[in-house]
């Protein structure tokens, strides 16, 4: 099954997440199909917290990709920010 989920990056105690489309059988930070955005929970000042390609997310969801709970919330936040 294809899922849209977070893949952790960054350094120890400084998380940074790529939002990726991946096969659910692959490791969390392993092989992915496409990177559709990023999430930086520790962004400060003018740094961007969330960037998401909503068109590609819609494409994958329409083709049957499932989203994790956290990614679903981030998608909702991104839609609210663009509206």
From Swiss-Prot:
GO terms for molecular function: structural constituent of ribosome. Keywords: Ribonucleoprotein, Ribosomal protein. One of its GO terms (biological process) is translation. GO terms for cellular component: cytoplasm; small ribosomal subunit. PROSITE patterns: RIBOSOMAL_S16 (PS00732). The keyword Ribosomal protein applies. Belongs to the bacterial ribosomal protein bS16 family. This is Small ribosomal subunit protein bS16. It comes from Shewanella sp. (strain W3-18-1). The lineage of its organism: Bacteria, Pseudomonadati, Pseudomonadota, Gammaproteobacteria, Alteromonadales. The gene is rpsP.
